[in-house]
């Protein structure tokens, strides 16, 4: 009987061994190939990864670190950091669970961040006279703010988290000012744009936003009416920022076409990115 069981395990068509999302992610981003890859893919990724894993398409010298961000009964998210001596980049692997087990369904990252470094290089290369001219033309977003904001927008998750912790007293001060102003006291409705405009125009709020290189405060960036989102920046609907929601039960769910990652920073704060 023991030998018959071993034989069955080797027969063609045998069910793949069940793997957890983190295990699948580690295999999928490893620099070597992964023969049973297709058994663990579904949805859009099944059509994208036809012959190579993501790891085979990434330059071999890059270090790859996988971290489980969330795992429920039906969905899971694993963050992948790619790193070398000069840079870091983050991807997010979204999983679904079906009757056969966990499958990798979608891969997401913050869009258009490649635009940031050339813009920073251009701005930091301006001579003093042109910087002064820039500041006159952009009184609400100075040269120093724009450079700092662009750098923060294109930073790796680990660097944004470190930035938040280093400046947490100012983030808490900004939060208290927004809450004290009661700009978002009413439920979201037709007056939401006016409430948001009033919050961002408040002198104390505006000063702290600019000091922290933040673009704006809003409730609309993450479609969470009970959350405050302090947006760093982004393009179209692909944004990054810091979200505040002290009640975990009210956090929005992560999804490939919504919030692609939500990473806890402590005391009700989260780093978020949208698709």
Which sequence ranges carry the predicted segments?
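Sec-dependent N-terminal signal peptides
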Residues: 3-12
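Short, low-complexity N-terminal intrinsically disordered segments enriched in polar/charged residues
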Residues: 12-30, 118-121, 128, 147-162
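Short, aromatic-enriched amphipathic alpha-helices that serve as compact interaction elements
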Residues: 17-36, 167-175
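Surface-exposed, charged secondary-structure patches
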Residues: 50-94
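A short, surface-exposed beta-strand/turn
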Residues: 89-103, 239-252
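Short beta-strand edge/turn micro-motifs at domain boundaries
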Residues: 90-135
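N-terminal domain-onset segments
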Residues: 142-220
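Short, solvent-exposed recognition patches
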Residues: 193-267, 272-275
């Amino acid at each position: 009987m023991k030998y018959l069981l071993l034989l069955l395990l080797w027969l063609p068509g045998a069910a793949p061994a069940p793997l957890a999302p983190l295990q699948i992610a580690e295999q999928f981003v490893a620099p070597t190939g992964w023969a049973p890859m297709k058994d663990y893919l579904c949805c859009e990724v099944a059509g994208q990864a036809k012959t190579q894993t993501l790891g085979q398409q990434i330059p071999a010298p890059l270090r790859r670190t996988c971290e489980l961000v969330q795992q429920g009964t039906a969905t899971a998210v694993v963050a992948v950091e790619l790193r070398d001596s000069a840079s870091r980049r983050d991807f997010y692997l979204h999983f679904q669970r079906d009757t056969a087990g966990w499958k990798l369904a979608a891969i997401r990252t913050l869009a258009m961040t490649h635009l940031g470094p050339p813009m920073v290089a251009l701005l930091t290369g301006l001579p003093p006279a042109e910087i002064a001219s820039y500041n006159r033309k952009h009184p609400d977003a100075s040269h120093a703010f724009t450079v700092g904001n662009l750098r923060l927008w294109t930073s790796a998750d680990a660097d944004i988290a470190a930035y938040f912790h280093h400046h947490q007293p100012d983030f808490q001060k900004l939060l208290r000012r927004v809450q004290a102003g009661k700009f978002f006291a009413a439920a979201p409705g037709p007056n939401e744009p006016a409430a948001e405009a009033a919050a961002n125009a408040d002198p104390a709020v505006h000063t702290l936003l600019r000091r922290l290189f933040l673009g704006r405060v809003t409730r609309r960036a993450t479609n969470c009416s009970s959350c405050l989102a302090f947006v760093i920046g982004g393009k179209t609907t692909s944004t990054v920022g810091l979200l505040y929601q002290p009640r975990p039960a009210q956090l929005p769910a992560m999804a490939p076409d919504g919030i692609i990652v939500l990473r806890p920073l402590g005391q009700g704060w989260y780093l978020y990115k949208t698709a």
